[in-house]
Amino acid sequence: KIIPSRKTVYFENIYGDNPDERSQRVLAKADPFTIENLGDIEANIYHLGTLLADDFSLEVIKHLSTKGILSADAQGYLREVRGEQVHAIKKKKKQEALKYIDVLKVNEKEMEVLTGYDDPEKAARQLAEWGVKEVLITLGSLGSLIYAEGEFYRIPAFPPKEVVDATGCGDTYAA
């Protein structure tokens, strides 16, 4: 289903010497999703790959959680646009949304912003205590950690022959 928007989100990524760090500008911003424009979509699993904090409201998250398994990438929930610049935001009321999320994908920075923990196991346990059923934490070259039903599963990273651009690695993992 195509949901019309006045614009499509358009980012400019600016990288320095460290490919794991970037700054971003938003040159165009799409309209947020609403219950009305998502209401008739039926699926077993809904994945929210949000780009910015206001893409999906708490009401939309609650609504979709009643229709099927709800998966989300925390990335977009933790950044907002001021002017054209993308800025990290604190968890605000995002903890409220977590109890409706079945599967949550975060990276190391996102887990720390959400939980205050820099230890992946502590962060995963905290997210689960807040209601997330399955926590996926990407750890860059160290692979990833999955926490589900009280158990940890470590997945090693696959070393590439050459790193050209790290853009989209988290999105690819979530897919």
Task: Locate each region found by the language model.
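Conserved beta-alpha-beta core of the PfkB/ribokinase-like small-molecule kinase fold
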Residues: I45, G49-R125
